[in-house]
């Protein structure tokens, strides 16, 4: 317990009692100020209630003085205790007085008829003060009236009557039985610590966070997809990825750029009977064949081969120059031809039909590759292969060099043995994910995603298509939880899954840092409208971008507020003042208020419902999650080098596992 909290817990009650005892017996002194018998009687009677009223007044003043403090609940408990003692003393004094006159009271009358009204008034005021102190002790700073303007509803709401979704309605929309965790069922802006910034290492700033029921999405409405926007350091992993990975019961694919989620949740999911696979380039021996799903479940191999080529080359949503577009398109056609040669020509063994083999064929010297293409054209058993190769047979050397350079550049990451092993291995099959009992964590750090986004695109695209090609013949739904998804660049299969994934058992939860990231990856301002139209829920938290804050403010809508206006005029003959009330338009939340929101607070939008303002389910605040989470590699406990200890949460400083 801190010293400030201890003082607020003790001092108000002591000062209240000191004031009560110091003003006891003041009735004689006050009566002396009277100039008539009636005045003396009135002042004397007021002096009897003065000790109780003085104690109560000091307690109330203390509560208002502590308004905004993190320890105001302690002050509320102290004033509550002081009010209780004041009521007890007033009652005891009156009981003693009535007991002394009980023998003189006629038998047909009750001794309570002679109770002192002034003392009863003083005790009643102390009781009211105690109830307010109890409210402060329970709600903290939220017990005091807000300074927001008065909102008008009904017929007078000429400018709109937008309002936040009620918590009871949110509980029905997002029941706890759902597997995707949205947040916590409480209003952060009405919590006792609303005026304080959230700090992970300061438990006093948590407020009701971690103790409130969860809001979870069960995929029962809309497309079942969700989008999360949270700024850098905005607790994206701790409030979305880890809690959902702990609670989701179906197939799970997680893009984990920090490589911290898998070690923290793998054991919990294995205990639940799940098969957990971690695709980590630093740990060899784990990989799958990214081409093993091609042509299965009634789909044509040619279409699937083209899809793989687009993931490696990446589509560009923005308009490029004609020259660049020609070389990129030709390089994609060359890559398509080489993949088709491996898969369709019939001269490559099934177990050797991998992207590693495609890269080996492509990385040959340019003259040798041209000779190979001519040989493929003359001897391939597939018409599709011949049609794609024919363009390059008689292409001029200069043009072919540009095409060749583009293709080699885009497949450069396949020359790394550890990266190629991830998409050319045999430790598991894409069918394992579609069968519903497998979870896959893609542990590619930001450096790898930045330098080789094609690797992540191929992995995620293969897993998505393996489910999509089954036409809904899968066990349960598979959740793709993609953190830092903007690093992947433009991925068309994600748009396909966005528009039709619900029917095929695919659910997407994508995490961006801002609207700008989405627009950069998916082609300008039109990207937001396409994605928002297809999302069941959209969450905004820890926003630092003014454009994003302005969008949130506009989407929340406008309210009608009543404004008091005072006009003063001064002239030669004097001055006058007039007061009036008028109705004005005000956004439900202003852009600067969005920027000032606590980082553990979020705004969630759903189609056809008011905006929801609620808390975030940060895992280290919840005892039920801490009990089943493994060690965080960025906050190691025990001995060793830990550069985060100084700012680590309390349980990490104590050396205990969360």
UniProtKB/Swiss-Prot annotation:
Residues spanning the signal sequence: none
Key word Membrane present: yes
Highest taxon, organism lineage: Bacteria
Annotated Polar residues bias: 562-573
Keyword Transmembrane helix part of the UniProt annotation: yes
Localization (cell): Cell membrane
Transmembrane segments: 6-26, 46-66, 72-92, 118-138, 215-235, 275-295
Keyword field: Cell membrane, Conjugation, Membrane, Plasmid, Transmembrane, Transmembrane helix
Topology class, membrane: Multi-pass membrane protein
Disordered: region residues: 562-585, 637-658
Any one GO cellular component localisation term in the record: plasma membrane
Disulfide bond residue pairs: none
Cited PANTHER family: CONJUGATIVE TRANSFER: DNA TRANSPORT (PTHR37937:SF1)
Assigned protein family: Belongs to the VirD4/TraG family.
Protein name: Conjugal transfer protein TraG
Source organism (scientific name): Agrobacterium fabrum (strain C58 / ATCC 33970)
Name of encoding gene: traG
């Amino acid at each position: 317990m801190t010293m400030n909290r201890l003082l607020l817990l003790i001092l108000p009650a002591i000062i209240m009692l000191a004031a009560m005892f110091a003003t006891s017996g003041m009735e004689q002194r006050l009566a002396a100020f009277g100039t008539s018998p009636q005045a003396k009687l009135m002042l004397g009677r007021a002096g009897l209630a003065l000790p109780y009223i003085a104690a109560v007044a000091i307690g109330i003043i203390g509560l208002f003085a502590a308004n905004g403090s993190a320890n105001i609940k302690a002050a509320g408990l102290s004033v509550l205790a002081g009010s209780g003692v004041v009521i007890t003393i007033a009652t005891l004094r009156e009981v003693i007085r009535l007991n002394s006159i009980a023998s003189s009271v006629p038998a047909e009358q009750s001794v309570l008829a002679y109770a002192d009204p002034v003392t009863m008034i003083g005790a009643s005021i102390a009781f009211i003060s105690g109830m307010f102190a109890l409210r402060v002790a329970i709600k903290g700073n939220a017990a005091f009236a807000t300074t927001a303007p008065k909102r008008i509803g009904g017929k007078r709401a000429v400018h709109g009557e937008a309002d936040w979704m009620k918590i009871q309605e949110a509980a029905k929309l997002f029941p706890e039985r759902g597997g995707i965790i949205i947040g916590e069922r409480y209003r952060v802006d009405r919590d006792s610590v609303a005026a304080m910034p959230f700090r992970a290492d300061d438990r006093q700033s948590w407020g009701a966070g971690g103790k409130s029921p969860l809001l979870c999405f069960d995929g029962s409405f809309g497309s079942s997809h969700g989008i999360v926007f949270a700024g850098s350091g905005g607790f994206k992993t701790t409030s979305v990825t880890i809690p959902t990975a702990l609670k989701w019961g179906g197939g799970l694919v997680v893009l984990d750029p920090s490589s911290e989620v898998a070690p923290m949740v793998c054991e919990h999911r294995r205990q639940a009977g799940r098969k957990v696979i971690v695709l980590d380039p630093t740990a060899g021996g784990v990989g799958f064949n990214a081409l093993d799903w091609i042509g299965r479940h009634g789909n044509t191999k040619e279409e699937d081969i083209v899809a793989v080529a687009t993931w490696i080359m990446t589509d560009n949503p923005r308009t490029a120059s004609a020259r660049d577009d020609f070389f990129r398109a030709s390089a994609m056609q060359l890559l398509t031809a080489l993949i088709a040669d491996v898969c369709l020509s019939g001269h490559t063994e099934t177990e050797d039909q991998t992207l590693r083999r495609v890269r080996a064929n492509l990385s040959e010297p340019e003259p040798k590759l041209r000779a190979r293409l001519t040989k493929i054209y003359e001897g391939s058993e597939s018409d599709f292969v011949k049609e794609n190769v024919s363009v390059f047979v008689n292409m001029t050397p200069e043009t072919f060099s540009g095409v060749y350079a583009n293709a080699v550049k885009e497949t450069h990451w396949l020359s790394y043995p550890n990266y190629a092993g991830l998409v050319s291995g045999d430790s598991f099959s894409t069918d394992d994910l579609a069968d519903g009992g497998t979870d896959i964590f893609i542990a590619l750090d930001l450096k790898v995603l930045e330098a080789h986004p094609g690797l992540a695109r191929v992995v995620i695209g293969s897993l998505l298509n393996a489910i999509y090609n089954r036409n809904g013949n899968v066990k349960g739904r598979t959740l793709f939880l993609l953190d830092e998804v903007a690093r992947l660049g433009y991925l068309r299969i994600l748009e396909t899954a966005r528009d039709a994934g619900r029917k095929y058992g695919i659910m997407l939860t994508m995490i961006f840092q801002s609207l700008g990231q989405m627009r950069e990856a998916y082609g300008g301002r039109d990207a937001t409208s396409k994605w928002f139209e297809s999302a069941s829920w959209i969450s905004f938290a820890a926003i630092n971008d003014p454009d994003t804050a302005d969008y949130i403010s506009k989407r929340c809508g406008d309210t009608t507020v009543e404004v008091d206006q005072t006009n003063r005029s001064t002239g030669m003959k004097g001055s006058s003042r007039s007061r009036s009330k008028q109705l004005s338009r005000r956004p439900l939340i202003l852009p600067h208020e969005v920027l000032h929101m606590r980082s553990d607070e979020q705004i969630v939008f759903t189609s056809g419902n008011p905006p929801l303002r609620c808390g975030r389910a940060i895992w280290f605040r919840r005892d039920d999650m801490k009990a089943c989470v493994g060690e965080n590699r960025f906050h190691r406990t025990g001995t060793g080098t830990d550069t985060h200890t100084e700012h680590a949460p309390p349980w990490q400083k104590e050396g205990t596992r969360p």
